[in-house]
Design a protein with these regions (language model features):
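Short, conserved active-site entrance elements at the starts or edges of catalytic domains
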Residues: 2-33
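Structured helix-beta-strand junction loops
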Residues: 24-25, 70, 131, 140
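Short beta-strand segments
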Residues: 25-59, 65-67, 73-77, 86-89
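Charged, gly/pro-rich active-site loop segments
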Residues: 2-13, 80, 85-149
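A generic secondary-structure signal marking the coil-to-beta-strand transition
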Residues: 18, 26, 51, 85, ...
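Alpha-helix boundary/capping residues
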Residues: 25, 71, 107-111
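Short secondary-structure boundary/capping segments
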Residues: 19-20, 45, 65, 125-127
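Hydrophobic alpha-helical segments typical of transmembrane helices
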Residues: 14-18, 63, 103
Length: 149
């Protein structure tokens, strides 16, 4: 498990004005750091548990491997109905295996009309080849657009 270095109680909070981009089915861009220091960005499904922004990946995918190497990440979500409205969460990512498949299936229902990920969105055979993790992003900084902040 990759964990944050700062206690959750001191992390910046997402203001009520910008909770909806985290709870609506809007896509985010998660940026992680490659071992050579180059940024790597991925389009991701996003969730929020009241403390952390959540995304789902595998330990085998590039973003999962990058987080294992360096837990510093950035998540950007832009409201497609008002592209001047956004939230950026910078922080430390914690990869958690427990409950990750259930989290992925919740995201699948949120973002698609399918009941679960494997067998509908992705081949069921792939499930045995992957170790699913929920990426908990412990915020060190929350940035909002200036217009709606």
């Amino acid at each position: 498990m990759t964990g944050p270095t700062s206690p959750a109680s001191t992390q910046p909070r997402v203001p009520d004005s910008h909770l909806d981009p985290l709870t609506r089915p809007l896509h985010g861009v998660l940026t992680t750091m490659m071992p050579d220091g180059q940024p790597q960005s991925s389009l991701v499904w996003v969730d929020y548990d009241g403390e952390c922004a959540l995304v789902n990946t595998t330990r085998q995918r590039r973003k999962g491997r990058n987080i294992e190497f360096n837990p510093r990440v950035s998540l950007l979500i832009v409201d497609p109905a008002d592209t001047g409205r956004f939230i950026q969460i910078r922080g430390l990512a914690e990869l958690v295996e427990d409950g990750a498949l259930e989290h992925l299936d919740r995201l699948t229902r949120k973002y698609t009309s399918h009941p679960c990920y494997y067998g509908f969105v992705y081949p069921v055979e792939q499930q045995a080849l992957e170790t699913r993790v929920t990426c908990h992003i412990h915020a060190t900084r929350v940035t909002l657009d200036a217009i709606h902040a």
